[in-house]
Structure formats: C-alpha cells, structure tokens
C-alpha cells in the first residue's frame, strides 16, 4: 500500500461493525483496512465464559454491592447455616459440631470492636423498624449512612442506640420526602418520643444535615390509601391544602394534622365518610388536632359541609 493510500485509510474512520478484538495480541483491528486502531488494550471482562445466567452466577468471583444496612457493609464472609458440604451432602454429627464452632469464631471475628458491636445492634434495629414501617431500601440505606456518621462523630456515646436509630430513620424519611411522623417511628422503638426528638435535633445540628420542609400533600396519598379512599377524594384533599397554603393557613402547623383534616373534609364532601378518630389514628395525630385544623380550614376557606 502506498503512503497516500495509508494516510487515506487512516483518515477514513472504520465502521463500528468492522472492528474486531484480537485477544491474543490485545489489539483492536479494522477488518476492512487491516489498520490497528488500538494496541495493548486491556480486556476488562472475566477470563471465563458462561452460556447461561446460572453459569455466570456460579463462576463469578465477586460479591454484591456494599450494603449500608449491614454493620460491615456485607464485605465479610459468612459460613452457611445449611450444614452441607460442597457436594450438597448433609454433614455427619461430628463434622456438624466442628462447623458450629467455626461459625461461632467467625461471628466473633466479624464483631470484634465496640464500634462493630454497636453497628451490628443498630443495623438490626434499623432493619426491624424499617420493615415495620414498610420503608423502601433507599430510605433504609440513607438512615444507615446517617447513623454511621453519628457514630463517627461520637454522637451515640451516652445515648441509647434505639433513640439514635429512630432519629436517623426520621431524618432519612424527611430527606427522601417519605411521609412518616416522629410519633409513628417512635411507637416501634423502646425509646420515648422526647428522646428521639432530642437525638433528631442533635443529628441535624452536628452532622449539618439539611432537610426540606414537610409538605402536607406528601401525607395525603399515604393516609388516603390506608383509609381506602378514592383518587378523587385524595385530589380534593390536595386542592384544599393548596388553597390553605395560598391563604397562609399552613405556616407553623403540623403537616400530618393538616393532611388529616383536609382528608376528613374531602371525604365528607365526596360522601366517603370516615370518623375523625379513624383518620387521626392513621395519620399519627390526635383527634383534637384533626378537629382544630378542620374548624380552621372550613371557616377560613368557607367550605360548606352538607348535614353539618
């Protein structure tokens, strides 16, 4: 090939479907011109081949992603509890006792320091509360990350693990705009509400965490769904909240209480009546709160309730 032809071949880009990788030489070659596009390329893929998803999973030697809700983030190994060998055969009693001893030592090795023990207990508590509240994994991961930062800052020292975990969950819910009240979270832990609230304020201050202002509308869908209300009733409740915002009635008010009152009004107007007690229990507020917000909204927005 002449020099002019060579320069012309180099100037013309090789079509993507004509580029092949020579594994032996580590080169990307254009089959159309024979030009070496890249040499000494590193193959980032595995050295093994698999033809089914099962084979791929079996031959892979890497673990899953880091898990914030496990005290060691899931990077340590765990001895299986199935009491079976590599061939799937059940272990004999003598071997089973030996493996049991290995397990005990392996657990002790995983949880050696006081911080490890603290995190192990805290992550179990976090998982328990998260499951009871039906929180998504993203919120639990955020709560675990907040708790780990609190441990690093020494905020847990002198405080109960339960109260700091509950406060971390509440902070995560606020950050992720997940409609959960402090009372709702506190009822699933041994710590009292006042202690959880104190830890929550401490976490925000010391970790410099910014949380958005709670919007009453975020609570409407969840409360309405648990009450079995129709979409039109929930939409009406959101409209009532919007009008209340425009009139300046939401400032300084508990968002859950406002949402509960708006739902109560919308349910009455749409003939899907629910009692104040029923709505208050679902919303995690008192009947008095629902009653007071109801009076404010109906009077200030001039809402006429039939048969009232």
Curated annotation (Swiss-Prot):
It comes from the Archaea. InterPro entries: Cyclin-like_dom, Cyclin-like_sf, TFIIB, TFIIB_arc, TFIIB_CS, TFIIB_cyclin, Znf_TFIIB. GO terms for molecular function: DNA-binding transcription factor activity; TBP-class protein binding. SUPFAM superfamilies: Cyclin-like, Zinc beta-ribbon. Sequence repeats lie at residues 124-207, 218-299. One of its GO terms (biological process) is transcription preinitiation complex assembly. GO terms for cellular component: transcription preinitiation complex. Gene3D superfamilies: 1.10.472.170, Cyclin-like (1.10.472.10). Keywords: Repeat, Transcription, Transcription regulation. Pfam families: TFIIB (PF00382), Zn_Ribbon_TF (PF08271). Stabilizes TBP binding to an archaeal box-A promoter. Also responsible for recruiting RNA polymerase II to the pre-initiation complex (DNA-TBP-TFIIB). HAMAP family: TF2B_arch (MF_00383). NCBIfam families: PRK00423.1. Belongs to the TFIIB family. This is Transcription initiation factor IIB. It comes from Sulfurisphaera tokodaii (strain DSM 16993 / JCM 10545 / NBRC 100140 / 7) (Sulfolobus tokodaii).
């Amino acid at each position: 090939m002449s020099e002019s032809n060579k320069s012309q071949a180099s100037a013309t880009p090789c079509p993507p479907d004509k580029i092949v990788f020579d594994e032996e030489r580590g080169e990307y070659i254009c089959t159309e011109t024979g030009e070496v596009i890249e040499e000494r390329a590193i193959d980032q893929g595995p050295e093994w081949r698999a033809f089914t998803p099962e084979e791929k999973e079996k031959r892979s030697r890497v673990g899953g992603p880091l898990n914030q809700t496990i005290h060691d983030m899931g990077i340590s190994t765990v001895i299986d509890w199935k009491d079976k060998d590599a061939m799937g055969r059940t272990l004999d009693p003598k071997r089973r006792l030996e493996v049991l001893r290995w397990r005990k030592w392996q657990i002790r090795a995983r949880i050696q320091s006081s911080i490890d023990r603290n995190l192990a207990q805290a992550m179990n508590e976090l998982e328990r509360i998260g499951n009871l509240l039906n929180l998504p994994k993203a919120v639990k991961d955020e709560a675990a990350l907040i708790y780990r930062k609190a441990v690093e800052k020494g905020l847990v020292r002198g405080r109960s693990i339960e109260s700091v975990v509950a406060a971390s969950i509440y902070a995560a819910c606020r950050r992720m705009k997940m409609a959960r009240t402090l009372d709702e979270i506190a009822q699933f832990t041994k710590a009292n509400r006042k202690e959880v609230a104190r830890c929550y304020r401490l976490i925000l201050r010391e970790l410099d965490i910014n949380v958005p202002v709670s919007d009453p509308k975020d609570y409407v869908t969840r409360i309405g769904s648990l009450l079995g209300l129709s979409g039109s009733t929930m939409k009406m409740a959101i409209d009532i909240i919007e009008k209340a915002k425009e009139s300046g009635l939401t400032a300084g008010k508990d968002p859950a209480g406002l949402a509960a009152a708006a739902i109560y009004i919308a349910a009455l107007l749409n003939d899907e009546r629910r009692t104040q007690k029923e709505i208050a229990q679902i919303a995690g507020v008192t009947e008095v709160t629902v009653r007071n917000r109801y009076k404010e909204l109906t009077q200030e927005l001039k809402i006429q309730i039939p048969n009232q």
